[in-house]
């Protein structure tokens, strides 16, 4: 596996990895004003993994939201509809529109508003590549011998109102008898024979039936051979399904999943279900997926050191997405943004304030990487775009972080818990959440939500101040705090004219550190603070409670945009973004490393080697840039036939003792056998 391929899975910072994942989250229904609402699915599907084949029948009960003459559903382009019938078993025509992966079914007699009917679809196809995926180049539905997965996002059954239309379902999956199927809802298993139409052998099969009787977003299925681990600790019915290669870490992931699930219960109350299946996915799909009672993690994401952040995000979706869901695309942050910040809160619980600070930095970078459209207007963006996903996830998470600062800890926690309880099993809007927050705050919060949802941009704070000596005894002895010894008068400035937020000021003195909450309004906000010790340094927002456009955030945002472009194959544009980062910090090891990656992909090995050396000699942030630069230099020397120099680089990589992303295993591998450049595809 080349370093670029790793970049997609493991070498990105968490925010970048998350962004790569988010780029490929599929679209909602093309028409925001959905003309129909699916109420229930009855699906029978037969999987033939060796042939990558599926045959299915889906009964779809739906209700017209307005007078309806044509029923439109999304369906994977590799699936061919062979027959559509109505409730009287009368055949109907069906038009396939490949441009938007839809099936259009004219209704001969129409359907009046609020009336319901059921259509039965018979369809089949092979799912073995990502060529016709709803997201080109990424598998969201795949059938194969080792592991088969059919995600709701993959449109393997007729879908309407993706992510907003809550539904119930009964899904029966017929597979070879040696396979296990994981899904959502109450499960029953029976020994059956595959339907004759689909049978190509006499091998025994089993049918797994999942009944999801609480409306949500079931429909994601994983089938394969797994080792199962169980836990009923804290009343949680947890099942972990990992491949044999990860059996050694399964107990640690089991323990962490229990801890995260119970932590979220203390914050938000009980979820829709206290059952959870954690299942390993192949490495050719999303880093993780979620569905009712299910979290899937791709194999490369299951690391020896428990990947508790990614796991926490998936588990948090059992509240935000499964239980409470967005009413529209403009409300999408109520799912992904809430899950993102729930993850950050667990990080704080597990790793302390330093862990939260790192998570907030990641969210800040994502929030400002594509801050060109207000979050409240996210529906105007293409949902396949990084802009949309950056807004709903990272800016959404940062809005909660800032609201926590405005409300205070107790009122914020009460707001989150009440929102989770009041809208459990329902779709919610941003206004629904704002009303609960205002009730607990005791005052209107229009200014806050308008500023962060209806506007773009973020402040960059600057402070200037003057210190005056007072006549208090503390001026002579900072430890004598009978009276203040110094007065600091100053001004906080920033560029946003309509900006309003409380901001924390920290004054480091010869004595104790002083903190003061200052209301910043407009471009210039004066303050006066009296201290006992002589002020030595004043910091604005030292704990990163407010989304700010600092130079570090600008640098990391440029790198994040570059990585997204690199994953899309636009290396020239990626290089431009990485160079923007260098303009902000010529010594940035991460920027040099990313530039080296681009040159490596272009097979410009001399320029790549130069950039890797610059990364090694840079600021060393993050630390892993050194070990991976050494490994990459070794690969370059192997490619150019300089084995002795290559071995020396691998040896220096081992000497760092930094095993980030499995670096030491990689170095040992190429110490034993020279790296060979992959052949270019025709």
Question: What are the residue ranges of the model-derived segments?
Answer:
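Glycine/proline-rich low-complexity spacer/linker segments in large multi-domain proteins
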Residues: 113, 123-169, 547-567, 576
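Zinc-dependent metallopeptidase catalytic helix centered on the HExxH motif
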Residues: 294-358, 416-417
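Beta-strand-rich binding/interaction modules
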Residues: 81-85, 182, 445-446, 459-540
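Amphipathic alpha-helical substructures
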Residues: 66, 272, 382, 389-484, ...
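Acidic/His/Gly-enriched intrinsically disordered linker/tail segments
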Residues: 213, 287, 332, 336-407, ...
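Hydrophobic helix-coil surface modules that form long, contiguous segments used
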Residues: 56, 160-312, 341-344, 536
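N-terminal, polar/Ser/Thr-rich
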Residues: 23-55, 63, 82, 139-143, ...
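A surface-exposed beta-strand-loop module
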Residues: 78-139, 195-203, 207, 522-534
């Amino acid at each position: 596996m080349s370093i670029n391929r790793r970049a997609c899975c493991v070498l990105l910072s968490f925010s970048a990895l998350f962004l790569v994942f988010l780029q490929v989250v599929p679209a909602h229904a093309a028409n925001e004003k959905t003309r129909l609402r699916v109420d229930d699915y009855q699906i029978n599907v037969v999987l033939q993994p060796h042939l990558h084949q599926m045959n299915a029948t889906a009964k779809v009960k739906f209700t017209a939201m307005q007078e309806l003459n044509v029923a439109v559903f999304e369906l994977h382009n590799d699936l061919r509809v062979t027959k559509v019938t109505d409730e009287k078993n009368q055949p109907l025509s069906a038009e396939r529109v490949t441009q938007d992966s839809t099936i259009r079914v004219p209704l001969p007699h129409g359907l009046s508003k609020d009336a319901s009917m059921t259509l039965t679809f018979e369809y089949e196809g092979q799912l073995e590549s990502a060529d016709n995926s709803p997201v080109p180049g990424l598998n969201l539905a795949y059938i194969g011998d080792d592991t088969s997965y059919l995600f709701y996002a993959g449109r393997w059954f007729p879908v309407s109102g993706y992510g907003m239309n809550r539904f119930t379902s009964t899904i029966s999956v017929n597979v070879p008898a040696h396979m296990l199927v994981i899904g959502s809802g109450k499960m029953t298993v029976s020994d059956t024979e595959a339907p004759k139409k689909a049978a190509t052998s006499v091998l025994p099969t089993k049918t797994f039936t999942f009944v999801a009787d609480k409306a949500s977003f079931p429909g994601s299925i994983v089938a394969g051979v797994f080792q199962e681990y169980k836990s009923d600790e804290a009343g949680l019915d947890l099942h972990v399904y990992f491949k044999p290669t990860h059996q050694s870490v399964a107990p640690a992931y089991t323990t962490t999943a229990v801890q995260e699930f119970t932590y979220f219960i203390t914050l938000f109350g009980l979820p829709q279900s206290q059952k959870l299946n954690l299942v390993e996915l192949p490495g050719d799909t999303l880093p993780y997926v979620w569905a009712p009672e299910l979290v899937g993690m791709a194999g490369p994401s299951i690391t020896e050191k428990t990947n508790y952040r990614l796991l926490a995000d998936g588990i948090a979706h059992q509240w935000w997405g499964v239980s409470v869901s967005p009413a529209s695309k403009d409300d999408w942050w109520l799912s992904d943004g809430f899950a993102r910040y729930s993850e950050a809160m667990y990080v704080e619980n597990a790793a302390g304030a330093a862990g939260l600070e790192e998570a907030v930095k990641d969210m800040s970078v994502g929030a400002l990487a594509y801050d060109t459209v207000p979050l409240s207007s996210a529906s105007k963006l293409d949902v396949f775009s990084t802009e949309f996903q950056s807004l709903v996830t990272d800016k959404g998470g940062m809005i909660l972080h800032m609201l926590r600062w405005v409300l205070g800890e107790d009122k914020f926690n009460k707001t989150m818990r009440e929102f989770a309880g009041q809208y459990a099993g329902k779709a919610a809007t941003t206004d629904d959440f704002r009303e609960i927050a205002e009730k607990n705050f005791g005052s209107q919060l229009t200014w806050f939500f308008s500023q962060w949802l209806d506007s773009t941009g973020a402040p960059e704070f600057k402070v200037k101040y003057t210190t005056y000596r007072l006549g208090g005894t503390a001026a002579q002895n900072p430890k004598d705090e009978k009276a203040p010894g110094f007065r600091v008068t100053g001004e906080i400035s920033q560029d946003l004219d309509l900006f309003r937020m409380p901001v924390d000021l920290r004054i480091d003195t010869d004595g104790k550190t002083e903190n003061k909450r200052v209301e910043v309004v407009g471009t210039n906000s004066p303050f006066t603070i009296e201290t006992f010790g002589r002020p030595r340094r004043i910091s604005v927002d030292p704990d990163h409670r407010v989304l700010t456009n600092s130079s570090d955030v600008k640098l990391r945002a440029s790198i994040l945009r570059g990585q997204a472009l690199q994953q899309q194959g636009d290396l020239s544009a990626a290089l431009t973004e990485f160079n923007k980062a260098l303009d902000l910090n010529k010594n940035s090891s991460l920027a040099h490393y990313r530039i080296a990656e681009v040159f490596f992909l272009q097979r410009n090995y001399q320029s790549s080697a130069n950039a890797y050396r610059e990364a090694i000699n840079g600021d060393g942030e993050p630390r892993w840039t050194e070990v991976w630069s050494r490994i990459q230099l070794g690969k370059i020397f192997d490619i150019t036939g300089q084995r002795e120099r290559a071995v020396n680089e691998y040896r220096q990589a081992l000497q760092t003792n930094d095993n980030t992303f499995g670096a030491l295993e990689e170095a040992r591998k190429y110490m034993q056998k020279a790296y060979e450049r992959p052949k270019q595809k025709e």
